From Swiss-Prot:
Family: Belongs to the TACO1 family. YeeN subfamily.
Matching Pfam families: TACO1_YebC_N, Transcrip_reg
Protein name per Swiss-Prot or TrEMBL: Probable transcriptional regulatory protein YeeN
Signal peptide: none
Keywords: Cytoplasm, DNA-binding, Transcription, Transcription regulation
NCBIfam families, per the entry: PRK12378.1 (NF009044), YebC/PmpR family DNA-binding transcriptional regulator (TIGR01033)
GO MF terms, alphabetically ordered: DNA binding
């Protein structure tokens, strides 16, 4: 099910290590989560989850603390979530999820990126119906059957458990992601490389080298935009 998560984690780590942009994006997400509830992660499940993901991405503690302190201090910025869908070359599809304090700016920027990078922005729902929402948990391991038993005993709604290059990859129903993480922690598994709500393509395409270069430029440009938090696509060889 889905793309090779071991490769995705490796690429993400390499890219994140080369830029501080990921820190800024997590800072915004942490601030927004803290503003929507209590600025204490022990009292705010959403905030706690974002902080855990930030730590997986090796976001420094001072960045996390600064975002929480800003929320405690009564920062007046309001952030709105958004989703933009579109198409690349030869059946490739892409979804960009955003978190922004200026929706008009974000719409203009995303539309410009699609136009300049060989894509076409689509209407809401034009792409997302070809993706499934899922919780994804990835950690080092080699016994998917044992992990499945742990999750089954905890009554976690699991779609699939696989082993990829020394990593256990778990797909859960979106509503059971946190339950799955809790069950694994109770079983002594505490180090995760990914704990995310993701959109998984129902089917994938492989692009030619020429089309892949265009599509990769589109993905990179979207990921580099300050307001874009996540990018999903259906290209198997990226």
């Amino acid at each position: 099910m889905g793309r090779k998560w071991a490769n995705i984690v490796a690429k993400k780590t390499a890219k994140d290590g080369a830029t501080s942009k990921i820190y800024a994006k997590f800072g915004v997400e942490i601030y927004a989560a803290a503003k929507q509830g209590e600025p204490d992660p022990e009292l705010n499940t959403s905030l706690k989850f974002v902080i855990e993901r930030a730590k997986q991405a090796q976001v420094p503690k001072h960045v996390i603390d600064k975002a929480i302190d800003k929320a405690k201090g009564g920062g007046d910025e309001t952030f709105v979530q958004g989703r933009y869908e579109g198409f690349g070359p030869n059946g490739s599809m892409i979804i960009a999820e955003t978190l922004t304090s200026n929706v008009n700016r974000t719409i203009a920027n995303v539309r410009t990126i699609f136009n300049k990078k060989g894509g076409n922005i689509g209407a809401a729902g034009s792409v997302s119906y070809m993706f499934d929402n899922a919780g994804v948990i990835v950690f080092k391991g080699s016994d998917p059957d044992h992990i499945f038993e742990i999750l089954l005993e905890a009554e976690v709604d699991v779609r699939d458990v696989t082993e990829e290059e020394g990593n256990i990859v778990i797909y859960t129903e979106p509503t059971d992601l946190h339950k799955g993480i809790a069950a694994l922690k109770a079983a002594g598994i505490t180090e995760f490389s990914t704990t995310e709500l993701e959109m998984i393509a129902q089917s994938e395409v492989e692009l030619s080298p020429e089309d892949l270069e265009i599509f990769e430029g589109l993905v990179d440009a979207l990921e580099d935009d300050d307001d874009v938090q996540k990018v999903y696509h259906n290209v198997a060889n990226l």
